[in-house]
Amino acid sequence: RKAEEMIAAGEVRVNGSVAKIGDKVDPKKDKVTVKGKPVESHVQEVYIMLHKPRGFITTMSDEMDRKCVAELVQEIPERVYPVGRLDRDSEGLLLMTNDGAFANAMMHPSKHVPKTYRVTVRPSITEDQLTQMAVGIEIEGRKTAPADVRVLSQEPGRVVLEMVLYEGRNREIRKMCEALGLEVARLKRIAIGPVRLGML
């Protein structure tokens, strides 16, 4: 309340310009002054490795009242946000942070940070299908980037694959499998770059 009064009185400046109520401020980049005196920022950077269960959407709020990952981190006092996405039916490693530079470095396509998944498909997979996944598949008019794919285990009716992707298009693994006539029974992200799910 007091802060709003000071802003309304024109006593608060952001990077030299008079602040308005509702202005967004990045404490790491913006210089905030009150009555000409700099305000020191003490933002604690927080990094969370979360094992997202199936059934949760990767968002901090949902107007349709579906379960979202915000519920899993509500005990954390800092406001954190997901780094990238995992769809509702997928599970596994999700990073959350309040460090925008870190989030951008991890997710920006130019960085090519590898993301590793364990994927259970049905009914079986051929060498030709594995090769197509490895070299890239045409999906919605665009070819997927090459992926590293290997078979971890195989039994009648199901195959477990390890897939490493270097780009992160929306639902890419599911779309690749669908294009090859494979059903995804389970999809779990186990690593983002050097950060592994481990025992979570």
Task: Label every model-predicted segment.
Residues 1-200:
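Basic, flexible Lys/Arg- and Gly-enriched helix-loop patches that mediate nucleic-acid binding at interfaces
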